[in-house]
Amino acid sequence: MNIQLICETENPEKFTALCTQYGLVHDPESYLALVQTYDEQGQVRLELRKLDEAKLGAVFVDFVAGAMAHRRKFGGGRGEAVAKAVGIKSGYLPTVIDATAGLGRDAFVLASIGCRVRLVERHPVVRLLLQDGLQRAYADSEIGEMLQQNMQLLPVSHIAQLNPALDCVDVVYLDPMYPHKPKSALVKKEMRVFQHLVGADLDADNLLEPALALANKRVVVKRPDYAPFLAQQSPHFSRETKNHRFDIYLTG
């Protein structure tokens, strides 16, 4: 993939090696840039910037502070919609594969509750952002040990590469990117950056079959309320929220 590669830190060697490993090629004409920089505490982090719309800000993964820390401490916990959708109950914490991990937010909610979550991410830039955020979180004194136990990024880029006989879990969770309505305003500025990078998930339908093969209990698909069923396959039932629904396919 071609993207601007910018290093603002003193030691670019690791950044260069990571980019090479993930097939990223520096393109000085690209408006999207993967940047290795310093955060407010002086720690090295990776972030994504849209250079022609700097006001949108950078996209990065931070499980320790900011919105994710607030959600962990003051969010709904087991009452969150994603927790109900995967079937969390008193005394039952399913094992989960998040096959479209993205920035890891839903997976982090489940991991914070106590689920063991394995992550798969197909886009190389998003995978690097997620890997970087996890590594920084693993080193945190408050949540590092919990996340090392409960959130693991798998060394595959698609769940079709997993073996149902060896890698099965209770729940497979899917949240593929879906185009916004043409006239709708994007709620979050960072989503404009993220969607410009990833675009619509045109092969999302190909996720359902391997997901069903890996899930012992259910497959959960998060969709906008206006989106059709994944792979045109009707779920056993759905859970609806204000703007989304969770389509649930039972497997056992």
From Swiss-Prot:
Family membership: Belongs to the methyltransferase superfamily. RsmJ family.
Family matches, as SUPFAM superfamilies: S-adenosyl-L-methionine-dependent methyltransferases
InterPro entries per the UniProt record, alphabetical: 16SrRNA_methylTrfase_J, SAM-dependent_MTases_sf
A GO CC term attached to the entry: cytoplasm
General function of this protein: Specifically methylates the guanosine in position 1516 of 16S rRNA.
Cellular location(s): Cytoplasm
EC number: 2.1.1.242
Name of the molecule in the record: Ribosomal RNA small subunit methyltransferase J
Disulfide bonds: none
Alphabetical UniProt keywords: Cytoplasm, Methyltransferase, rRNA processing, S-adenosyl-L-methionine, Transferase
Reactions this protein catalyses: guanosine(1516) in 16S rRNA + S-adenosyl-L-methionine = N(2)-methylguanosine(1516) in 16S rRNA + S-adenosyl-L-homocysteine + H(+)
Record-level Gene Ontology MF annotations: rRNA (guanine-N2-)-methyltransferase activity
Residues the record lists as binding S-adenosyl-L-methionine: 105-106, 121-122, 175
Pfam families: SAM_MT (PF04445)
